[in-house]
Amino acid sequence: MILRRVFIAIGCVLFSPLSQANSSLGEVNIELRGNVVDFTCAVVAGDSNKSVNLGTWPTKQLHAAGDATQPVAFSLKLEGCPPGSASITFSGTPAPGTALLALADTAMAQKLAIEIRDGDQRRLPLEQASKAVDIDNNGNATLKFYANYIALADGVQPGLANADATFLINYN
């Protein structure tokens, strides 16, 4: 008899409108999305650990904030890509308050950063995808970029000016 009352009590609670009420307290909705592809692009062997020499520049070339050196062209060649287009997103440590690439060490040149530009020589901020390039019928694509030094403030101080960036291939 007691067992029967327990089942009735549990049934009343389970089917009660209060137990069915939606509460947003402590509720979190997460939506996960992605794609699975048959194959991905590969970076041509010589481009996977690319070194771009930006040259040696006098500080008078970088006298005032915003002054920049001559851009140096470089490209990233992809092969074995799926049909469509590809773009590149560069990542790295940003210079304070900018989307420019910070130098690798604070003991290096001062008040200086590295600007990455797209194939049209427009600034390409870190963490922003470049303009997409069509992949040819053989699955190849070449994406062209430029890089240069840029003064963050007046009075750039001399020294080594190296930085590291990584890139992500985006498929479109």
Curated annotation (Swiss-Prot):
Cell compartments where the protein resides: Fimbrium
UniProt cross-references to InterPro entries, sorted A to Z: Adhesion_dom_fimbrial, Adhesion_dom_fimbrial_sf, Adhesion_dom_sf, Bact_Fimbrial_Adh_Pro
Domain of life: Bacteria
Keyword tags: Disulfide bond, Fimbrium, Signal
The keyword Signal belongs to this UniProt entry's keyword annotation: yes
Claim: Cell cycle is one of the keywords in the record: no
Disulfide pairings: 41-81
Signal peptide: 1-21
GO annotations of cellular component type: pilus
GO biological process assignments: cell adhesion involved in single-species biofilm formation
NCBIfam families in UniProt: PRK09934.1
Similarity comment text for this entry: Belongs to the fimbrial protein family.
The name this protein goes by in its record: Fimbrial-like protein FimF
Protein source organism: Salmonella typhimurium (strain LT2 / SGSC1412 / ATCC 700720)
Gene this protein is translated from: fimF
